[in-house]
Amino acid sequence: TPTDSYLLAFESSQNVTFFGQTYVPDSVRSSVAVKGQGNSIVANSNSSGAAFPVYLSARIFPSRSSYKFDIKQEGRHWIRLYFYPIPGNNLTSATFTVVTENFVLLNNFSFKSYNGSYLYKEYTVNVTSDILMLTFIPSNNSVAFVNAIEVVSLPDILISDQAQGVSPTGPFNGLSGRALETIYRLNMGGPLITPQNDTLGRTWENDVKYLHVNSSAVNVSVSTTSIMYKTAVTPEVAPHFVYSTAESMGDANVPDDNFNITWVFKVAPTFMYLIRLHFCDIVSTSMNTLVFNIFINTDLASGS
């Protein structure tokens, strides 16, 4: 159980269950304080488009407003933000910024391009004090809003301070001082994993739509009961459901050295990316027979 766990449904009149997690009205959490002025709105429960209960209510901020979360455990925390521009409140034209004390999470973000659809954002930040401030700043002639917020502590083992650089190559230090935004989290060869099946409340989507050539890969799966964790690895790193499925080469006997499985992701070119790969050999029939290379674009990330 996380030491810090805030799951808030803003302006909800009751607890809300969403993918197995319970969100409480923000008004009942005494350890969460708000600074600034905010109007509240509540969507009609029959509102078209708001298919999930966590999106049925929201708080609107006409001016700069902050939420203060009391933190018991310093270190990495999830910050998850849920947005849905509830019809009839002119929120589809909202443009605003969301910041912590040290990081900009959203910068002059506009909902005009989302055409009234949902928006979910997930970040991890290293909290180094007993308070986390989350501030919403409307742009000129606009408002800010939010439907739900999660602030949840996570184990330090999940993200180390060092990673292996690819371009340029070499060790990269200082991850603990950086904020990270989740862009993609995939369950290779397996179904969607929702938060109730992940001890850290993560969502893992199926990888098929990112495959460059669908026929290049085949799904492999085993029972989750057969998955064994080493001492340094726990289900918090990734749940059994992740390690019990995989994508394997469509034909491992192809003589062409260029045969591969490739996934393609759209990314913003101006950012640095942390890529985490999870492996559990559920394919080999004998020891030390699984040999392959990993490339990121044209750079060799890991060689056999």
PLM segments and residue spans:
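Compositionally biased, intrinsically disordered or flexible polar/acidic segments
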Residues: 1-304
